[in-house]
Amino acid sequence: CYACKQVCPLCYCEQCIVDKSMPRWIDSSATVKGNFAWNMIRAFHLSGRCIGCNECERACPADIPLSLLNRKMGTVAMNEFNYRHGTDVNQPTLIGNYNVNDKEDFIL
């Protein structure tokens, strides 16, 4: 339903990937596959940026504990990439920044 997207202060992309239809990257149907894809993509986009306001959980009609996923992604961002949001206003987002020295051992 994307209620979390509508209420999140950090969802501000001009065109969200779930709204893109050519090509359709994310299945927008209310299925396990579509829900999983949406929540994972959103977690990646917010990794290291979530401010912990928990509005996503408040807005979720399915009571999905989204803050757990967001906190985990923030921890991974810090541990794996030494990235912490809010420390520098000029710092690019985690997924908006490429560093040739980033770890790659998790890539299959």
Residue ranges and their predicted role:
Residues 12-108:
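Ferredoxin-type iron-sulfur electron-transfer modules in oxidoreductases and energy-metabolism complexes
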Residues 1-13:
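Long, well-ordered mid-to-C-terminal structural blocks that present hydrophobic/aromatic surfaces
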